[in-house]
Structure formats: C-alpha cells, structure tokens
Amino acid sequence: MAVVAGLVRGPLRQASGLLKRRFHRSAPAAVQLTVREAINQGMDEELERDEKVFLLGEEVAQYDGAYKVSRGLWKKYGDKRIIDTPISEMGFAGIAVGAAMAGLRPICEFMTFNFSMQAIDQVINSAAKTYYMSAGLQPVPIVFRGPNGASAGVAAQHSQCFAAWYGHCPGLKVVSPWNSEDAKGLIKSAIRDNNPVVMLENELMYGVAFELPAEAQSKDFLIPIGKAKIERQGTHITVVAHSRPVGHCLEAAAVLSKEGIECEVINLRTIRPMDIEAIEASVMKTNHLVTVEGGWPQFGVGAEICARIMEGPAFNFLDAPAVRVTGADVPMPYAKVLEDNSVPQVKDIIFAVKKTLNI
C-alpha cells in the first residue's frame, strides 16, 4: 500500500509544481481618476521621492487648495513643505524662484493664471532667462501651475488662456494637459526638469474622471515634455488641440466619422517646445489641417502651428488652406449665452472640418 501511495503522491506533487509554476499575477487594471486626483497623485509621489520638492501658494495647505488639488498634502508633509502664502503673487513667486536658484524644487501655484500677471517679472525675467544668462551654470527648476483658460461664470479677469503668452518666451517650457494621464505624467516631468515649467491646467477639467492605464499608475511614470499624442487615428484631416478642446475635437470626430469623415486628433500636451514633427507627419498623411484652441486668435497657438506648417515640408502636402478654431476676439463675457459663444464648441469644429474639406 505504501508503494501504491507513493506512486500516486509522486505525480500529484509534480502536477502541483506545474500549477504553481504556471500561476502568475495579472497586470494591474486601469482605474478611474479625476484630473484633480491625478495632479495630486503626481505631486505626492514627487514630494515623497525628493525632499527638495515643496509646494507654496494661496490656500494650498490647510484648506487643501482653492480647487482641492493639494488635498491631504499638508497633513502628510507639514508646514515646511506645503506652505500657505499671503495674497501676493509677486512676493511668493519671487520666493519660489529664489528657492529654485538655491537648489530646491518649488511648485508655485497660482489660484488662476490670470493672477500670474502680478508676478510676470518673476516668471519671465527671473525664472525664464537666468539659465541662459548664466551660460547654463544656474538652473531654475521651478513649476508654475494652476487653472488656465475659460471657466464658468467668472468673466474676463478669470477666464483668459495664457498658452500663447508663455509659449512665446524662450527659457520656459509650457505644458497643457487634457486628461488624467497627461496631468500626472506632465506634472512629474515638470518637477524633475531643471528648466522653469509652466503647467496650464483647466478648472473645468479638474472634476472630470478618465481611465488611468496601468503603466500610468507607476511612481516612475513620466510623459516626456515636448511630445504630442495622437488620440484618434484618421486619414482625411488633422485636428490639433490642447487642454479641454481636445475632448471637443474627439466628440466632433465621432460625429464626423458617422458621415464618413475620419479625423486624426492630436493632443499637443506641450506648447513649448512644440512637437511640430508629429503635426507635420499627420498633415503629410491627411493633407488637411484644423487647429483648435480656447485662446484668442491673434498671435495664438493655432497661428504658430499654421506658420510652422507653411514654413516646413508639410506645406506642399496641403490640399486646402489650414483653418483655425479659436476663442472669440473679445474679453470673456459674463452672460452665459455670450460666454458659450466665446469659446469653441463641437459644432464649430465640425463646421471648420467640413469647410476645410469643402463639403
């Protein structure tokens, strides 16, 4: 009987070993994360990773931020690394720039980028130009971040898009996330960069949840600054946007697809340095271009893209003039109906695409 039992147990042990060897842990599933939570997670991971990183701004600490983007960080890291400041943008931006020059890595939050005008000398003259003026000897590793562009019912002094303003300045890097993956990957890359980086968020996107893929859940996840992403493949026309209008472009593309028009939608992610190569490659394939932005038309991001295409190799591939969809050339009105008509809507993008394709 012992011999028989041994003969039985032997194969069972072998089978058990095979089962164990074949067992593997499944990859982490995608999770739903709001843009607000993604920025918070990215800052939290970098604060934990590098003790030189700190956050300062109005109400970022005990109040968890005006838009709750810094929720929980003050309780975790304390007064020395999450710092409430007086209402003086020039003052706390200057402190942040000085700290960056001294070797720290500050994250300077503006409650809205409209208020960054109070600190424009610190951002442009002190932060953006110093690395170059010092022949590369004095880096200024600082992130200026906060909500940018149109919001809801806050009128002209709280609704301006500053992508073109800051994208105009050599020495700055400018990023503009759309979804949660963008937000987390770009804030982490911005914090680690030795150049001053302006991160233009959008108040209306903070509470919007997106699927965060498994790779983006890693603490090592970064999105390279200066690289765009094709959000939707297409063959008939290239549509380029950044920030919230990317979502509008995808909605328009879905509508147009039902009519047999396939749009290639490019999410810029970075305003400066701009990934013009990605746009050129797409235009060479589709032979048509529409740009979409929430900012004003004159000297805007779309105008720069059109100029680059005209001056580069993709121009000879265009079958029709490029078309821009922009915000209205007026200060943002307060009245709801006027406000809605002052920023690009899905119908405006559809109209521009059909105009470009002569449909």
From Swiss-Prot:
Residue sites binding thiamine diphosphate per the record: 89
Record protein name field: Pyruvate dehydrogenase E1 component subunit beta, mitochondrial
Subunit structure comment from the entry: Heterotetramer of two PDHA1 and two PDHB subunits. The heterotetramer interacts with DLAT, and is part of the multimeric pyruvate dehydrogenase complex that contains multiple copies of pyruvate dehydrogenase (E1), dihydrolipoamide acetyltransferase (DLAT, E2) and lipoamide dehydrogenase (DLD, E3). These subunits are bound to an inner core composed of about 48 DLAT and 12 PDHX molecules. Interacts with DLAT.
Marked site positions, Important for interaction with DLAT: 319
Alphabetized UniProt keyword annotations: Acetylation, Carbohydrate metabolism, Glucose metabolism, Metal-binding, Mitochondrion, Oxidoreductase, Phosphoprotein, Potassium, Pyruvate, Thiamine pyrophosphate, Transit peptide, Tricarboxylic acid cycle
Boundaries of the annotated transit peptide in chain numbering: 1-30
CDD domains linked: TPP_PYR_E1-PDHc-beta_like
Function comment: The pyruvate dehydrogenase complex catalyzes the overall conversion of pyruvate to acetyl-CoA and CO(2), and thereby links the glycolytic pathway to the tricarboxylic cycle.
Binding site for K(+): 142, 190-191, 193, 195
Gene giving rise to this polypeptide: Pdhb
Species per Swiss-Prot/TrEMBL record: Mus musculus (Mouse)
GO terms for cellular component: acetyltransferase complex; catalytic complex; mitochondrial matrix; mitochondrion; nucleoplasm; pyruvate dehydrogenase complex
